Every structure is written in structure tokens, then in C-alpha cells.
Amino acid sequence: MAKSKNHTTHNQSRKWHRNGIKKPRSQRYESLKGVDPKFLRNMRFAKKHNKKGLKKMQANNAKAVSARAEAIKALVKPQAIKPKMPKGPKLKRLAFIAHPKLGKRIRSYMAKGQRLCQPKPKVQTKAGAKAPAKAQASAPAQAPKGAQAPKGAQAPVKAP
């Protein structure tokens, strides 16, 4: 006799309803608020008879965390000032210098760059220093900021 189409195969419905209708994940673990649901799912502690194991594990974790905090407090001196970590190009520079292979080359390369970028000091002789001062004194007094120069006039040019 052929199977009727409107009946499921044996035990299918029992299999579907074995776990019951599940609540949404946010409401699934009411008694263990504050515990990461992912953690519960991974460790299979969501079942009621295993909650004791979870509580023990949580207690052990808390003890370990507090012990670690105490150890850190004992090691770290509160009055010591932390050195500031350089940011951006300074950090990059330090990283290059500390590099085992690139360190030697980069030092000379950076030194050369610094030499090229330095502003050159203006060297003036005594006679040269007096000449521009006289030129400024002999030039006519400048007009106030708001006043405009006549149309054909040009700005005064400084003497070399």
C-alpha cells in the first residue's frame, strides 16, 4: 500500500517538539543575568542541572581576577610616572632605529635629512647690519593701515 502524503514519517513530530518552543535569546537565560549568553551556549551550562558548575566556575574566575589585580598592585608603584608614548612620525622613527637590519642605515639617512632641513643662520657683517637700518630710517613714514595709496603709486622696494 502506498504511503499517504498527509502524514509525516515516524517520530518526526516528536523530534521537532522535543526541545519545546524556544524563547528568544535575550530572554532565554533569565536566572543568570549578566552572564554572556555566548559563553553559556559554548560551555553547555544553560541546562538547569548544570548551573552549579557554572557558579563554581564564575567564583574561581572572580578569585583569579582579584588575585591578579592584587599582584599588579604590588608590582606597580603608584608614585612612578609613566613615560609618554610618542605618536606618529616620532614612533615610526624609533621603530626604524630599533630594527635590527634597518637601524644602521636609517640613522645616517635621518641625520642627513635633519641637516638638510635645518634653517641656515643669517650671517651679517657689522657694516652690512648698519646699512639696512639707515635705509629704513631714510624711507618715508608709512601710511596708516586704513589709508590707500594713490592709483599709480607702487610699494617701496627694500634696498639689498
Swiss-Prot record:
GO terms for cellular component: cytoplasm; cytosol; cytosolic large ribosomal subunit; cytosolic ribosome; membrane; postsynapse; presynapse; ribosome. Residues 126-160 have a biased composition (Low complexity). It comes from the Eukaryota. GO terms for molecular function: heparin binding; structural constituent of ribosome. The modification Phosphoserine is found at S31, S138. Sequence repeats lie at residues 127-134, 135-142. The modification N6-methyllysine is found at K5. Pfam families: Ribosomal_L29e. The modification N6-acetyllysine is found at K33, K145. It is found in: Cytoplasm. Residues 127-142 are annotated as: 2 X 8 AA tandem repeats of A-X-A-K-A-P-A-[KQ]. Residues 1-34, 115-160 are annotated as: Disordered. GO terms for biological process: cell-substrate adhesion; cytoplasmic translation; fibroblast proliferation; multicellular organism growth; translation; translation at postsynapse; translation at presynapse. The keyword Metal-binding does not apply. Keywords: Acetylation, Cytoplasm, Methylation, Phosphoprotein, Repeat, Ribonucleoprotein, Ribosomal protein. Gene3D superfamilies: 6.10.140.1730. Residues 1-26 have a biased composition (Basic residues). Component of the large ribosomal subunit. The ribosome is a large ribonucleoprotein complex responsible for the synthesis of proteins in the cell. Component of the large ribosomal subunit. Belongs to the eukaryotic ribosomal protein eL29 family. This is Large ribosomal subunit protein eL29. The gene is Rpl29.
